Amino acid sequence: MELNNYQKQVMRDLSAYLDCVNRGTNLFSAWREYWFSKDVAVGLGGVPSYNNSIERAPHVCMKVPTGGGKTFMACASVRRIFDALPTGKPQVVVWLVPSDSILTQTIRTLSDVDHPYRQRLDQDFAGRVGVYTKEMLLNGQNFSPDTVREMLTVCVMSYGSLRIDSRKKDVRKVYQENGNLFRFAEYFKDTQALLADTPDTALIQVLRHLEPIVVVDESHNAESKLSTEMLNNLNPSFVLDLTATPRKNSNIISYVDARELKKEHMVKLPVVVYNRTTRQSVIQDAIQLRGSIEQEAIAAEAAGGKYIRPIVLFQAQPRTGENSDTFDKIKAMLVSMGIPENQIAVKTSDVDDLKGQNLMSRACEIRYIITVNALKEGWDCPFAYILASLANRTSTVDVEQILGRILRQPYAMQHSSPLLNTSYVLTNSVDFHTTLEKIVVG
């Protein structure tokens, strides 16, 4: 898997910024020089001034729409960043994710030697790559000063596993004395790098001493004071944020327009938005539209195209009152309309009908997925064509994130029918519709 055109431009932007950091006297001058080279002012109507929230380490963001291949670009960035850092340091990456579902997904893809993400890392580091979970690190499983010196070490962890104020016992272990890591303590030369009031053998001390590159996936979730403290506690040498919806104080070095993704057939655009007057009509029309798209998909496959089974993603309301359109009510309505139960899956914080399912498989029957917030980010399925929202969301970030779940283009290729190259949204919420229109037009 090779970088496409817009991804190559993002890599060029990163390299240009790293050059400015190495030439500059501080992070503020590097930021000004980088944007000056693009004829863009800093402040005064230009890009915002550099936000120096992480002590002594460059902290920048790539703004890439959902479906744009952020994770692959992050993998391609690692070699570039290490090449720009002082030589002789251990090559360690701490890869942070916001949820358990994304954690599992990231560990799986980075560990799979046949997956493009891992193949990119293997290509750039001559196959000498180790991927570790928090549990593996705590147990010292193939994790020692020797292995760290010899290979790229990628530590995949959740934000929550590093928050120092956590009351969870398994989280606090990161900050506790650990006999499995005593060999690392023998190598600590810079005692100023150690965290105060924390044992030398604690995992957090080991990571601080290694001064890792930190990759922050879905970084719009890591802007609180606690999250900033978490990042500073890692004593990073570089922080790379990945998100489609950066916060205002993000140091964005590269912007990718959704139209660039369309050119590369990465996403289903345009997004067609339908506003309905009742919740019942949202559900009925979503069923009918999905059926029409599936007929097009069957005809396209018969003419030599790829297999596609269109899916509707229903966004239900949280259980706040008797009139709430909760996931169980929506499922009951679908069944009453003649939809077989084996075509319906629920994905919430408590129910996970998607576990173990390969939605891209011809053997899978699922055509309707009902969620509340569990699929807001970090999940997408190219077969998801229709978002039917019964929730009254007004947050631009939340709406853009849920919209992103249906944008990825099946097989990253143009299909013969326009219906198969388009995403669809149905809603009966005026607030959701208004927020969505701003995103689509913008």
Describe the residue ranges of each PLM region:
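Conserved interdomain linker/interface between the two RecA-like ATPase lobes of SF2 helicase motors
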Residues: 252-347
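Conserved pre-motif I regulatory segment
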Residues: 1-63
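Conserved RecA-like P-loop NTPase helicase motor core
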Residues: 352-442
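Inter-Walker segment of RecA-like/P-loop motor cores
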Residues: 118-180, 188-196
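Post-DEXD/H (motif II) to motif III coupling segment of the RecA-like Helicase ATP-binding lobe
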Residues: 223-270, 285
